[in-house]
């Protein structure tokens, strides 16, 4: 059930990466 965590992490990571 780590899929959700991974997806959420990647989403947040991508958002921060794009925001920067």
UniProtKB/Swiss-Prot annotation:
Q: Which UniProt keywords apply?
A: Hydrolase, Lysosome, Protease, Thiol protease
Broadest EC class assigned to this enzyme: hydrolase
Cellular component annotations (GO), alphabetically ordered: lysosome
Q: Where in the cell is it found?
A: Lysosome
Keyword set includes Protein biosynthesis: no
Report whether Translocase shows up as a keyword of the record. no
Gene Ontology MF: a single term? cysteine-type peptidase activity
**What lineage does the source organism belong to?**
Eukaryota, Metazoa, Spiralia, Lophotrochozoa, Platyhelminthes
Domain of life of the organism in this record?
Answer: Eukaryota
Any transmembrane segments, and where?
none
Protein's UniProt name: Cathepsin L-like cysteine proteinase
EC id: 3.4.22.-
The UniProt entry's sequence similarity note says: Belongs to the peptidase C1 family.
Q: Report the function annotation for this chain.
A: Thiol protease.
State the species of origin: Fasciola hepatica
GO BP: proteolysis
Just give the chief location class.
other
